[in-house]
A protein has these predicted regions:
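TPR/TPR-like (Sel1-like) alpha-helical repeat modules
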Residues: 324-354
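Conserved alpha-helical positions within TPR/SEL1-like repeat arrays
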Residues: 14-22, 45-56, 79-90, 113-124, ...
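TPR-adjacent "capping" and linker segments in tetratricopeptide-repeat scaffold/adaptor proteins
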Residues: 1-13, 210-218
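Thr-biased low-complexity repeat/linker tracts and other Thr-enriched repetitive architectures
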Residues: 99, 167, 197, 201, ...
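Canonical positions in the second alpha-helix
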Residues: 36, 69-70, 103-104, 137-138, ...
Length: 368
């Protein structure tokens, strides 16, 4: 078969492959790719299509074998570097994925999406500083991509930069006014800033959207409940938490938060039951155990409260106020020595925080 006939046969196989693929007949489509590779081992199209299909079947390692073959043929085949990087990301091999995205960036520094992909891998590695740099690079190239702006707003939120997070949320909303995830981040940022009424406006936006995803609608009702609780609207907060539970009975945070609001209105027994529901869903939920302990404390069931606090300490010894709360419960039981040990632990933890703070300040000053 001469070169012309070979190319013509390859074109026919490419068409057949596409038809099989569209019909969901992946084995037949893969067989077409194998035929293409047999006809021309240097043909990129056979390996490339195979790589895509293997990716969709979640055979990420096998998919990467295809892209490695292409890279041997053409080291500057940017799509293969990108897809290899994505496969490695899916395999949680984040450092290796960054190598691939760096190679794609070297080939085309203005491909902003590869800065985004690199940023996502750095985010997964909790390298937030370099992740932010990547998002900034992407935004410098294209400041109209709502997804990149959202990723930066989310990272700013997680780093506690709430004011700046809101600014980027507003940029996203100017582009995509009904992006529920962005409204949720904006609302939570406002909540952290103590702007509870403004945060409720954001959560109500989400609640008013049609076809909202599960994460956003549950998050909106739950966070709205927290905002109402902070405003002292305890009954309204319970209505919100009930709405979350109606949508998703396994939403553990809503059960625990509901327990808090019930305690606020002195419905301590109901509060305990609500916390128990959260604990059934997640027995390692330290917050729910703590909330249950506080309600039992209010019911003067100090032994049971101590048991709850002990469970919290088992899960998270540094849980906020837990040693203090345990100390007071033990004090009520007239177990003074044990109580004092808890208060000593509070002092120790506070001193450690102070030392860490001083060390960080000293470190900053020494660099000046």
């Amino acid at each position: 078969m001469d070169k012309f006939d070979t190319q013509e046969k390859i074109m026919d196989l490419v068409k057949e492959c596409a038809e099989f693929y569209q019909q969901g007949e992946l084995l037949e489509a893969m067989a077409c790719c194998d035929e293409i590779i047999k006809l021309d081992p240097t043909s990129v199209v056979g390996y490339y299509n195979q790589g895509i299909m293997l990716f969709e079947e979640e055979h990420f390692d096998l998919s990467n074998h295809c892209y490695d073959q292409i890279i041997k043929i053409d080291p500057k085949h940017i799509e293969s570097w990108v897809k290899k990087g994505i496969n490695l990301f899916m395999l949680e091999e984040y450092e290796e994925s960054i190598v691939c995205f760096d190679e794609a960036i070297r080939i085309d520094p203005k491909d902003y999406l590869q800065w985004v992909n690199k940023g996502k891998s750095l985010y997964a590695l909790q390298n937030f500083s370099e992740c932010m740099t990547c998002y900034d690079k992407a935004i410098k190239i294209n400041d109209k991509d709502a997804n990149v702006l959202f990723l930066k707003s989310r990272l700013l939120y997680e780093l506690g930069n709430y004011e700046e997070s809101i600014q980027f949320c507003d940029k996203v909303i100017c582009i995509e006014s009904k992006d529920s995830h962005t409204w949720l981040i904006k609302g939570m940022s406002l909540l952290h800033l103590g702007k509870y009424e403004e945060s409720i406006v954001c959560f109500d936006e989400i609640i008013g959207f049609e076809d909202v995803d599960h994460y956003s609608i549950c998050g909106a009702w739950n966070e709205k409940g927290l905002a109402h609780r902070n405003l002292g609207n305890y009954e309204e907060s319970i209505v919100c938490f009930d709405k979350v539970i109606e949508i998703d009975p396994n939403y553990e945070n809503a059960w625990s938060n509901r327990g808090n609001s019930l305690r606020d209105i002195e419905k301590f027994e109901e509060s305990v039951l609500s916390c128990d529901e959260a604990i059934k869903i997640n027995p390692e939920f330290a917050g729910a155990w703590s909330n249950k302990g506080l309600s039992l404390h209010s019911l003067k069931k100090y032994e049971e409260a101590v048991s709850c606090y002990d469970k919290v300490i088992e899960i998270d010894p540094d849980f906020e106020n837990i040693w203090y709360n345990k100390g007071w419960a033990l004090d009520r039981l007239n177990r003074k020595k044990e109580s004092q040990l808890c208060f000593d632990k509070v002092d120790q933890l506070n001193n450690e925080k102070t030392v860490n703070f001083v060390d960080s300040i000293t470190g900053i000053n020494s660099n000046n």
